[in-house]
Amino acid sequence: MATYSITTLVENCVYHRKLEAEHGLSLYVRTPEKRILFDTGQSDLLIRNAALLHIDLKTVDALVLSHGHSDHTGGLRAFLAENDRATVFCKRDIM
């Protein structure tokens, strides 16, 4: 049986002492074949939280941006500075 996981990198609340929260959302999805980032949160906080969770964002294969609000795309530049090879999926007007 294949194992899939979804890890919250950025959300309004935190349940781990060392992580930080902010308004926004970023989820790290791991499948047997792919690593997917769903949204990037409001800032570069996803980079810090990913490091604390031992998630290497350089291994992300694809980034999915749900919509163009800043609390879902604000960390885009920070993510692309870490990973310039991931395929980005979004509506044309987001970029």
Where are these regions (language model features)?
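Basic/polar N-terminal segments that are highly enriched at the extreme N-terminus
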Residues: M1-T3
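Active-site metal-binding motif and surrounding structural segment of the metallo-beta-lactamase
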Residues: L45-C90
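Metallo-beta-lactamase
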Residues: I94-M95
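Conserved beta-strand hairpin/beta-sheet module of binuclear metal-dependent hydrolase folds
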Residues: S5-L53
